[in-house]
Amino acid sequence: MFKKIIILFLGIFLLSSCTDNFRNYFQRSANNKLLDIKGAKGGKRKPVYNNKYIDLAKKNILEDNIDDDDNDSDANYDSDSLLIGEKIDNIKKNREMYINMIKRDIARQKAESNATQSNNDMTLSKANKKVRKDDSYKEKKIEEELNQIKAMLRETKRDITKYTCPNATVNQNYVPPVTNYENENYPPIKNSRPYNNTSKVKQKFIREDDDNTSNACSI
């Protein structure tokens, strides 16, 4: 009877080695036990890991002591643009990209600050341009004032010509006569005889008066 039990047990063991399902039951659990009832949860067993490696991994994660795995097989893949087996470190590439962007921004800011500083500095050529600009502005203002004065003089001259005789001539050697007689207001002469407006003598005096008034503006 005992022999039959041993033969049956060995037969079951040999048959279970031919299938994967039965093989899983004889693997060690996470607690390093061949038969572990507590290790199975939800019909699945925990992977076989050593507890000291799990504790070491937790410690490294808390201390941020994570090294890149250069021997990772997932980092190597086939691509048309890359050779087979070429390693790509995305973290390193991103870090270099951001460093280059920061360097470009710093260089651009330095160039802009130098440009603004050079524009604010006074040089000999800038001083000459400024002086020429100021001189041209002053000359323009003076020319405008002269044109205004000339226009005023022309207008004054036109106003003067309105009150002068057109045929008047100026005698520079004219000296007014000196008389010792004082101006006296004599009373008008009373004459009862009427004036003869048709007399030749009176017409002659009228013509002489007209000639004198026409030449009155000539000195």
From Swiss-Prot:
Natural source organism: Rickettsia prowazekii (strain Madrid E)
Record-given protein name: Uncharacterized lipoprotein RP413
Endpoints of the signal sequence: 1-17
Bias (Polar residues): 112-126
Region of interest (Disordered), ranges: 110-136
Keywords: Cell membrane, Coiled coil, Lipoprotein, Membrane, Palmitate, Signal
Locations listed in the record: Cell membrane
Coiled-coil residues: 137-165
Source taxonomy: Bacteria, Pseudomonadati, Pseudomonadota, Alphaproteobacteria, Rickettsiales
CC per GO annotation: plasma membrane
N-palmitoyl cysteine: lipidated positions: C18
Covalent lipidation (S-diacylglycerol cysteine), chain numbering: C18
Topology relative to the membrane: Lipid-anchor
